[in-house]
Amino acid sequence: MASLKSIKKRIVSVKNTRQITKAMKMVSAAKLRRAQENVVAARPYAQKMGEVLQSLAGNLEGNLHPLLEKRDAKKLLLIVVTSDRGLCGGFNTNLCKAGERYIKEKQAEFDQISIMTVGRKGYEFLKSRHTVYKNFANMLSKPNYQAAAMLAQDVIEGYLAEEYDQVVMLFNSFRTVMSQDITFQQLLPIEPEEKIAADENGVEYIYEPSVSDLLTEILPKNIEVQIFKAMLESVAGEHGARMTAMDSASKNASEMIGKLTLQYNRARQAAITTELMEIISGAESIKG
């Protein structure tokens, strides 16, 4: 049986750990509230941006915009969005494993598959298994639109230079505090809907200066918005996953403290009983 001193030391150690996990849970809860607000605000904007883009693309006549033009898809770029920090359960691991399955499925379809990671954990997981084309770290601690615009510009330039023919983004969509949805979203090429003659109310729009000019502005902006939304979704999911993981860790620590305390009390009782028996035996031997 372990000594009283070692058991007491373990109890103190677990209590200190529980203090840390409780603090991390509270911090994640506070950050989650802000992250949720950002996601709720970004979703309608991203959705409306997509609707406007589809309307414009559906009414485009003549030559397609380069970002709408379909070509033989031989080179794929997969953008994997994970967190920079750990201690959030299977948040990053599950996503990266889904990415690996996707890569395996697409190997027969594409001659070349490049990987771009956003977040340190995705890079660390994938670099030992695949060649990571580019890595963007420290963008998600405080996600901002400028960072998303920079990433979008990099992606668009590579696509126009035909470094890849298709771009897919993989990220965790925030659903609830305890769950996230692994999401694959095709960024490029953008597939327009069929030509739209009029909206639901029978109104036909006239675009000024022209559909082509508007698309030149809105297509890159849409890529920026979709990447920024994915970053916000990932951050909210990360804080939710970390809060859940730290809550579970705190509960496990409390259970362990209870078991160790019981073990400590039993060991202490056994030590006292042994000591009493020795005293009684000593007294009996003196009498004898």
UniProtKB/Swiss-Prot annotation:
Disulfide bonds: none annotated. The keyword Membrane applies. It comes from the Bacteria. The keyword Transmembrane helix does not apply. It is found in: Cell inner membrane. InterPro entries: ATP_synth_F1_ATPase_gsu (IPR035968), ATP_synth_F1_gsu (IPR000131), ATP_synth_F1_gsu_CS (IPR023632). Keywords: ATP synthesis, Cell inner membrane, Cell membrane, CF(1), Hydrogen ion transport, Ion transport, Membrane, Transport. GO terms for biological process: proton motive force-driven plasma membrane ATP synthesis. One of its GO terms (molecular function) is ATP binding. Gene3D superfamilies: 3.40.1380.10, ATP synthase, gamma subunit, helix hairpin domain. Its main location: membrane. GO terms for cellular component: plasma membrane; proton-transporting ATP synthase complex. It is a peripheral membrane protein. F-type ATPases have 2 components, CF(1) - the catalytic core - and CF(0) - the membrane proton channel. CF(1) has five subunits: alpha(3), beta(3), gamma(1), delta(1), epsilon(1). CF(0) has three main subunits: a, b and c. NCBIfam families: ATPsyn_F1gamma (TIGR01146). Belongs to the ATPase gamma chain family. Produces ATP from ADP in the presence of a proton gradient across the membrane. The gamma chain is believed to be important in regulating ATPase activity and the flow of protons through the CF(0) complex. This is ATP synthase gamma chain. It comes from Trichlorobacter lovleyi (strain ATCC BAA-1151 / DSM 17278 / SZ) (Geobacter lovleyi). The gene is atpG.
